Design a protein with these regions (language model features):
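ATP/NTP phosphate-donor binding region
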Residues: 1-88, 341
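A glycine/threonine-rich phosphate-anchoring loop and its flanking beta-alpha core
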Residues: 10, 20, 110-207, 213, ...
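Short Gly/Thr/Asp-enriched flexible loops that form oxyanion-binding sites at enzyme active sites
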Residues: 77-78, 97-111, 144-145
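Glycine/serine-rich anion-binding loops at beta->alpha junctions
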Residues: 86-102, 136-142, 273
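Short alpha-helical scaffolding segments that buttress acidic/His motifs in well-ordered protein cores
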Residues: 194-198, 238-249, 286, 327, ...
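Active-site segments that bind and position negatively charged phosphate/pyrophosphate groups
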Residues: 200-326
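C-terminal charged capping/lid subdomain of soluble metabolic enzymes
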Residues: 301, 308-385
Length: 385
């Protein structure tokens, strides 16, 4: 087991009707920046619930956070936050809005008004604004982790940032907010969460039975309840998927294990270049990447196939192959693409993806740092075959 330190201070308030808890989570009189995206929270009633719960607070608002939040938009939000002298940022939305809020919390207090390079180097202000959130789309686990994935249009980059101080102080998770989501959003969320688990689980075998066992439970939960969520969007399915997606990336299953994240880095590049939904880039890349790395990952792939999918094969190579095939089939069942041809007329250029990774300094990927740009090309070419 790799040495680790684990701390997750985010207060989770889970269940239907819990948006009303904002009235005691944020003290009366607090100046709040309400941050959200394209306005769906106004159509589904969440916005009005938030306003009712914060009746005694002083609100400033910033709308228009993109699905892949833009650094340039966050800079504008920072000006609003400074002018309103807010004491907390409240993100209401999915992972993109929450990512933006966590990044924004440091931008507001940074002396450098263009802090991208500082933050990319891990240099954050000592004092930042607190962040709270109301989750409306489960997928990323952003509501209780320290990571923000931000795109800079000027730099033509999409990269992750990590700042423990920006981890939300609280997260309200009301599964009822998912009732208005369409099947594409729901399918994306399930596959994103599934991939988060896989990238922490299918790596180097270690003495981590607790982490592996919990990862397998989460994967089986998403396999069982993800399709049910698409079929009837029931209260039970919403609850189970929302909680599993949170547990997939709150730090717990990643303790003491080597982590991969190569699928995510390649996926970020594809999204930055072509605007394809984040989860759909993961479903395009992961099956091919697992086949490419099947020999190195064979022990864990075979365990995965047997413990998660119930594969009976006793030969590890055969079990691993079946596990990858079943994963690809699951992505299709959730309505996501698994081949570049599935996103036509977009044509994904391996050269362009590699160029993005090189600009981002992501030239050695995977848990062994053994995936080079040349291998990224092979993975993308294999995906198209």
């Amino acid at each position: 087991m790799v040495k680790f330190e684990f701390r997750n201070p985010t207060r989770i308030v889970f269940g239907e009707g819990q948006i009303a808890a904002l009235q005691y989570l944020i003290p009366v009189g607090t100046r709040v920046l309400l941050l959200y995206g394209g306005g769906s929270i106004k159509r589904n009633g969440v916005y009005n619930q938030v306003l009712a719960a914060l009746e005694g607070c002083k609100l400033a608002e910033f709308a228009g956070i993109e699905v892949n939040p833009h650094y340039e938009t966050i800079l504008r939000a920072a000006e609003v936050a400074r002018q309103a002298n807010v004491g907390i940022i409240l993100a209401v939305g999915g992972g993109s809005v929450i990512d933006a809020a966590k990044f924004l919390a440091s931008v507001v207090t940074a002396e450098n008004r263009d802090p991208w390079d500082d933050f990319a180097a891990g240099l954050y202000p000592q004092e930042i604004l607190p962040v709270g959130c109301v989750l409306t789309l489960p997928a990323t686990g952003s509501e209780s982790n320290a990571v923000s994935v931000i795109s800079s249009i000027e730099r033509d980059l999409k990269i992750p940032f990590a700042n423990e101080a920006a981890r939300p102080t609280f997260a309200i998770m009301d599964p009822a907010t998912m009732a208005s989501l369409d099947k594409r959003q729901l399918g994306n969320g399930v596959v994103d969460a599934f991939t988060h688990v896989v990238e922490q689980y299918l790596t180097i075998p270690g003495n981590t039975p607790v982490q592996y066992g919990y990862s397998e439970v989460l994967l089986r939960t998403l396999i069982e309840w993800g399709p049910k969520l698409l079929e009837d969007n029931s209260a039970e399915a919403r609850e189970n998927v929302m909680w599993a997606a949170n547990q997939a990336l709150n730090g717990l299953i990643g303790t003491g294990v080597r982590q991969d994240w190569s699928t995510h880095m390649i996926g970020h590049a594809i999204t930055a270049i072509y605007g394809i939904d984040h989860a759909r880039t993961l479903s395009l890349v992961m099956p091919s990447l697992l086949r490419f790395k099947a020999d190195r990952k064979q022990v864990m792939l075979a365990r995965y196939a047997r413990n998660v999918w119930g594969v009976a094969a006793t030969d590890d190579k055969m079990a691993a192959e079946q596990g990858i095939d079943l994963t690809e089939g699951f992505f299709r069942r959730m309505g996501l693409p698994v081949k570049p041809a599935d996103v036509a007329p977009i044509e994904i250029s391996p050269d362009d993806v590699i160029a993005h990774l090189q600009r981002a300094g992501q030239i050695r990927l995977g848990e062994m740092a053994d995936i080079t740009p040349l291998q990224v090309r092979d993975i993308l070419v294999h995906a198209a075959s």
